[in-house]
Amino acid sequence: AALRVKGNHDFGTTNLLQQLITRALTSGAYEEHVQQLRKRYAKKASAMMAAIQRHIPEGVKWTQPAGGLYVWARMPARVKTALNSKLFKAALRQKMIYVPGNLCYADDPTRRKPNREMRLSFGSASIKNVEEGIARLGRALRRVM
């Protein structure tokens, strides 16, 4: 009995969980769920891009997401995005936070990490909060640009 219990812990998932996953995959429930998520995230991505058009000053470049949950931005050369930057501090004062781009790169002694990029996520935020967050980022950017 002890070997059977140990085997369940060492070699994978329980039979019940495997059966549930099989049913979700073969019934179409999983694909239906993925389609719902895609629609939800597409709406959030569109909301973020529309908010960027309304609130972000000229000179900031943005990616148009073709997938995933992030929008990447590149600031003009004079604006840095690191944790100790004026922009990061201004964003915090606006009660808004972004991920500095330099935190998203692997350490590589042969390459410098970019210091004027940021990553914004629309994955867990509501559309209302996406709009408000981009408006706050716009105010922070205007203070430092």
Question: Residue spans of the language-model regions?
Answer:
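PLP-dependent class I/II
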Residues: 1-145
